[in-house]
C-alpha cells in the first residue's frame, strides 16, 4: 500500500508579488506580452522546485492562473462571452483579461464578467456566463502547455482540473433563461479531449476538483455526477477532490462514481476517517486533507498522525493539504519582525509542505519523534499568556441577554434621534471613506517607515480631515464623515489597535486578479488597550455644527477578513471583538459623537456552505453586532453598511441587528434589492445606494431622483436616506465632487416636492 504526499495547489503570486507587478505593468503598456509570460514561467518553475525541495511527491500543475482558475477553465472550454470575443474567433491572454477586468492592451473594452466569492473563502472567481445554444470546444491549452513545462523539468506531475459539474454550478445563465445543467453533455467531450491529451503525455493521476460535492445540492445536480463521470472514465486515474466541508451527506453519490480516489478535507469537514475507510470502495485511494490550506497555523502533527494512523496499510493513502495552499501566504522564513515565540506558532505554504513531508515519513516508518518536536511550539502555545487574557475571558463569560439589547425599541429611539439631529427629509450622507490621494498614502507610508515624526504626521492627517469636512459642507451634505485619511484598510486599522492581533510583512494572499491582501492574524484573546477612533472623530466634529459619524468596522467583518485562531470558536472571537468595540462606541458617545456606523459587509459572506448550518452562525453573528451597539443611548443613532446582492434569505437577521439606519448597495440592481425590505416590512431606516462608486461615471441629478422615487414606492419616504453605494476611497476627487453634488441636488429637489 503506497503512502505519498501532495498539495492541491500552491500560491501563484510569488513571494514579492511578482505576478501582480507583471500583470499591472503589462496592463499599463509598460511591458510586453512576452515579458509577462516569462514571469509566469519563472514563478511556476520556482514554485514546483520549492515544493519538491520541501519534500512533496506529486506536484500540482494547472493551479497557476493569469487571473483566476475558474476563468482559465472557462477559456479551456471555449466559453467566451460574445462581447469579449476577438473578431477572428481566436482566444489569447488579452481575451482572458477582458473577461476579468473589462479591458486589456488589445481588443475592445466591454463590461467585465461578474466576480463573486469562491465558496466561503476570501478569494474571488469570475462567474462563467451561459447563453442558450452555445457551443464548447478546446480553445485554451494553458494546462497542457504547463504540464509539458513541468515534465520537461523532470517533475512528478499531477494535473489539476476544475470538474465539469462544479464549473457549471458556479456559472449563471444570461439572457433567455434555461437550465444550465443541460449544458453538461456539451462540455464533456472537451474534458474527454483534455484527459486524452494528458494520457498521451504519460500522466497517471489527474486531480479533478468537484467542491460542489460538499454542498446541499439539488437532486438533479447530484444525479448528474454519475453519467458525467461515466463519460470521463478509463483514460487516466481520477482523484475526485473536495474541500471546505465534509462529504458524508453526499457519500452515496460519490462512491457510485467510476473514479480511482477521493480527496476529503479533514480539517473543515466532520467526516470520520474510520467511517470513510469503511464506506469507500476498497481499491480507492484516500487523499487525507490533514493540513489546513487556508490558515497560517503550525499543525499539531501528533494529532494529525493519530487521526490517520489506523488505516495505514489498509488502503493506498496520500496525505495532503485540506485545499489549495492558494489561501495561505508563501513563506514564513522571510518574516523578520515577528516575535520568535509567535513566529514558532505559524506555518505558511512552504512550511505546510514540510509538515506533509514529516507526516508522510512518520506514517511510513512509525517513528513519530520528528512530529513531536515539530508540534512542541503549538502545544506550548496553549498555556501562553499572549493567548489567554483572564479579564477578557471573564467578561465574555459574564455576557447576559441584556448586553445585546438597546434600552428601547426603534420607534422610541427614532423620536429621540429626530429631536436631537433635526435632519431634513431625504437626509444625505456618504458611507465613510473619501479619496485616498497620493498625498495621503505618502504621508502614511513616510510615518510607517520612520521618515516622518508623529507630530508632523498628525498635522498632515488633521489637514486632510479638515479638507474633507470643508468639501462636505460646501456640497451641502447633512451627515458628515471624517474621511478615514488615517486608515490604510478597514480591518487592518482596527487590528493594529487591538491586543490579540499580529501582522506580517509579506503575508500576502490573492483576492482576485492582481489584488492581494495581507490579513491580520488573531493570535489570542482580543481587547482594546486604548480608544482607537475617538480622537479623530472628535476633531472632525469640532470643525462643524453638522453631525459627524463615528466609523467602526464590525466584529464579524474583522473576524472574516483575518486569519482566525483555531483553538476557540469563531463565535468566541467575534464576541471578544464586539466587547472591545462596545467600549469604543461608549467612548465615541462620551466624546459627543451622536451617529456611529458599524460596518458589516462580511456578515453574509461568512455564512456556512450548508444552509442547515446558517441559523447557528446568524444567531451569534447578529448577537456580536448587538453587543457592539447596544451600549448606545436612545438618542445615539447606530448605522450599519452592507454590500450584498442578495438579502431575501437572511432578512430576519438583517432586521434583528436592530440598527437605526442600514445603508446598502442597490444602484447596480436598479433598486430591485429593496423588494426584500418591502416584502419583509423592514421597520427601521434605509439608505439605498444611489450610485455605483466602482465606476468613474458621474450620475445625473435626474437619474438619482428617478432611483429615489422608485425607492419611495417600496419604503416610506420618511425612512429613506440618500447616499452612494459604498466608500469613496478608490475614486478621484473630481468625479467624487461632481457625483455628490448631483446626489445632494436630487435630495433637495425631492424635498421641494
Curated annotation (Swiss-Prot):
Query: Where is 5-methyltetrahydropteroyltri-L-glutamate bound in this sequence?
Result: 17-20, 117, 515-516, 561, 605
Q: In which pathway does it act?
A: Amino-acid biosynthesis; L-methionine biosynthesis via de novo pathway; L-methionine from L-homocysteine (MetE route): step 1/1
Q: Which GO terms describe its molecular function?
A: 5-methyltetrahydropteroyltriglutamate-homocysteine S-methyltransferase activity; zinc ion binding
Alphabetized, the UniProt keywords read: Amino-acid biosynthesis, Metal-binding, Methionine biosynthesis, Methyltransferase, Repeat, Transferase, Zinc
Reaction(s) the record says it catalyses? 5-methyltetrahydropteroyltri-L-glutamate + L-homocysteine = tetrahydropteroyltri-L-glutamate + L-methionine
Cofactor comment: Binds 1 zinc ion per subunit.
One example of a Gene Ontology biological process annotation: methylation
What cofactor is this protein dependent on?
Answer: Zn(2+)
Q: Where is L-methionine bound in this sequence? A: 431-433, 484, 599
SUPFAM superfamilies (alphabetical): UROD/MetE-like (SSF51726)
Q: Which domain of life is it from?
A: Bacteria
Enzyme Commission designation: 2.1.1.14
Matching InterPro entries: Cbl-indep_Met_Synth_N (IPR013215), Cobalamin-indep_Met_synthase (IPR006276), Met_Synth_C/arc (IPR002629), UROD/MetE-like_sf (IPR038071)
**Residues that bind L-homocysteine:** 431-433, 484, 599
Where Zn(2+) is bound, by residue? 641, 643, 665, 726
Q: Where is the active site?
A: 694
UniProt record similarity statement: Belongs to the vitamin-B12 independent methionine synthase family.
The record's listing under NCBIfam families reads: met_syn_B12ind, PRK05222.1
Its job: Catalyzes the transfer of a methyl group from 5-methyltetrahydrofolate to homocysteine resulting in methionine formation.
Q: Mind telling me what this protein is named?
A: 5-methyltetrahydropteroyltriglutamate--homocysteine methyltransferase
Please report the organism this UniProt entry assigns to the protein: Shigella boydii serotype 18 (strain CDC 3083-94 / BS512)
Amino acid at each position: 500500500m503506497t503512502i505519498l504526499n501532495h498539495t492541491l495547489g500552491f500560491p501563484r503570486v510569488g513571494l514579492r508579488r511578482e505576478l501582480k507587478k507583471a500583470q499591472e505593468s503589462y496592463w499599463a503598456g509598460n511591458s510586453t506580452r512576452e515579458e509577462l509570460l516569462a514571469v509566469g514561467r519563472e514563478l511556476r518553475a520556482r514554485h514546483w522546485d520549492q515544493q519538491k525541495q520541501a519534500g512533496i511527491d506529486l506536484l500540482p500543475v494547472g493551479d497557476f492562473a493569469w487571473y483566476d482558475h475558474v476563468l482559465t477553465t472557462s477559456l479551456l472550454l471555449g466559453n467566451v462571452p460574445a462581447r469579449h470575443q476577438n473578431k477572428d474567433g481566436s482566444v489569447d491572454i488579452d481575451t482572458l483579461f477582458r473577461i476579468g477586468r473589462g479591458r486589456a492592451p488589445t481588443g475592445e473594452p466591454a463590461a467585465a464578467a461578474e466576480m463573486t466569492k469562491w465558496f466561503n473563502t476570501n478569494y474571488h472567481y469570475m462567474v462563467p456566463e451561459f447563453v442558450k445554444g452555445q457551443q464548447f470546444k478546446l480553445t485554451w491549452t494553458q494546462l497542457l502547455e504547463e504540464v509539458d513545462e513541468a515534465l520537461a523539468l523532470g517533475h512528478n506531475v499531477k494535473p489539476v482540473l476544475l470538474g465539469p459539474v462544479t464549473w457549471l454550478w458556479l456559472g449563471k445563465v444570461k439572457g433567455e433563461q434555461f437550465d444550465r445543467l443541460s449544458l453538461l453533455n456539451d462540455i464533456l467531450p472537451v474534458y474527454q479531449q483534455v484527459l486524452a491529451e494528458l494520457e498521451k503525455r504519460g500522466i497517471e493521476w489527474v486531480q479533478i476538483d468537484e467542491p460542489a460535492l460538499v454542498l446541499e445540492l439539488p437532486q438533479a445536480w447530484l444525479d448528474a455526477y454519475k453519467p458525467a463521470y461515466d463519460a470521463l472514465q478509463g483514460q487516466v486515474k481520477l482523484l475526485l477532490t473536495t474541500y471546505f466541508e465534509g462529504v458524508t451527506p453526499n457519500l452515496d453519490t460519490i462512491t457510485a462514481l467510476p473514479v480511482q480516489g477521493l480527496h476529503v478535507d479533514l480539517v473543515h469537514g466532520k467526516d470520520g476517517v474510520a467511517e470513510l475507510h469503511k464506506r469507500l470502495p476498497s481499491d480507492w485511494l484516500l487523499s487525507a486533507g490533514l493540513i489546513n490550506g487556508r490558515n497560517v497555523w503550525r499543525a499539531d502533527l501528533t494529532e494529525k498522525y493519530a487521526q490517520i494512523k489506523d488505516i495505514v496499510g489498509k488502503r493506498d493513502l496520500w496525505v495532503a493539504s485540506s485545499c489549495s495552499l492558494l489561501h495561505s501566504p508563501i513563506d514564513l522564513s522571510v518574516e523578520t519582525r515577528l516575535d520568535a515565540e509567535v513566529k514558532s506558532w505559524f506555518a505558511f505554504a512552504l512550511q505546510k509542505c514540510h509538515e506533509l513531508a514529516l507526516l508522510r515519513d512518520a506514517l511510513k516508518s512509525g517513528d513519530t519523534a520528528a512530529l513531536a518536536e515539530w508540534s512542541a511550539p503549538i502545544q506550548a502555545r496553549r498555556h501562553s499568556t499572549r493567548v489567554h487574557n483572564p479579564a477578557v475571558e471573564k467578561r465574555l463569560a459574564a455576557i447576559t441577554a441584556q448586553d445585546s439589547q438597546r434600552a428601547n425599541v426603534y420607534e422610541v429611539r427614532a423620536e429621540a434621534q429626530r429631536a436631537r439631529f433635526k435632519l431634513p427629509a431625504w437626509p444625505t450622507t456618504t458611507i465613510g471613506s473619501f479619496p485616498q490621494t497620493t498625498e495621503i498614502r505618502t504621508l502614511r507610508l513616510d510615518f510607517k517607515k520612520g521618515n516622518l515624526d508623529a507630530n508632523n504626521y498628525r498635522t498632515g492627517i488633521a489637514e486632510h480631515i479638515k479638507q474633507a469636512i470643508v468639501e462636505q459642507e460646501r456640497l451641502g451634505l447633512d451627515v458628515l464623515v471624517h474621511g478615514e485619511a488615517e486608515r490604510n484598510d478597514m480591518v487592518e486599522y482596527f487590528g493594529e489597535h487591538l491586543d490579540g492581533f499580529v501582522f506580517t510583512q509579506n503575508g500576502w494572499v490573492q483576492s482576485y486578479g492582481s489584488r492581494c491582501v495581507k490579513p491580520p492574524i488573531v493570535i489570542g484573546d482580543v481587547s482594546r488597550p486604548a480608544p482607537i477612533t475617538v480622537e479623530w472623530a472628535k476633531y472632525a466634529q469640532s470643525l462643524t455644527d453638522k453631525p459627524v459619524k463615528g466609523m467602526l468596522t464590525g466584529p464579524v467583518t474583522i473576524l472574516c477578513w483575518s486569519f482566525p485562531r483555531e483553538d476557540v470558536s469563531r463565535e468566541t472571537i467575534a464576541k471578544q471583538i464586539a466587547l472591545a468595540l462596545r467600549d469604543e462606541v461608549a467612548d465615541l458617545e462620551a466624546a459627543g459623537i451622536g451617529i456611529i456606523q458599524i460596518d458589516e459587509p462580511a456578515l453574509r459572506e461568512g455564512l456556512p456552505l450548508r444552509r442547515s448550518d446558517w441559523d447557528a452562525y446568524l444567531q451569534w453573528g447578529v448577537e456580536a453586532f448587538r453587543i457592539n451597539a447596544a451600549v448606545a443611548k436612545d438618542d445615539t443613532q447606530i448605522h450599519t453598511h452592507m454590500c450584498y446582492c442578495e438579502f431575501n434569505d437572511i432578512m430576519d437577521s438583517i432586521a434583528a441587528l436592530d440598527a437605526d439606519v442600514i445603508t446598502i448597495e442597490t444602484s447596480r440592481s436598479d433598486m430591485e434589492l429593496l423588494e426584500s425590505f418591502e416584502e419583509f416590512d423592514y421597520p427601521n431606516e434605509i439608505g439605498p445606494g444611489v450610485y455605483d462608486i466602482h465606476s468613474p461615471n458621474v450620475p445625473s441629478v435626474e437619474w438619482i431622483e428617478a432611483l429615489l422615487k422608485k425607492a419611495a414606492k417600496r419604503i416610506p419616504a420618511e425612512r429613506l436616506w440618500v447616499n452612494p453605494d459604498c466608500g469613496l476611497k478608490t475614486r478621484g476627487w473630481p468625479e467624487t465632487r461632481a457625483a455628490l453634488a448631483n446626489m445632494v441636488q436630487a435630495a433637495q429637489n425631492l424635498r421641494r416636492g
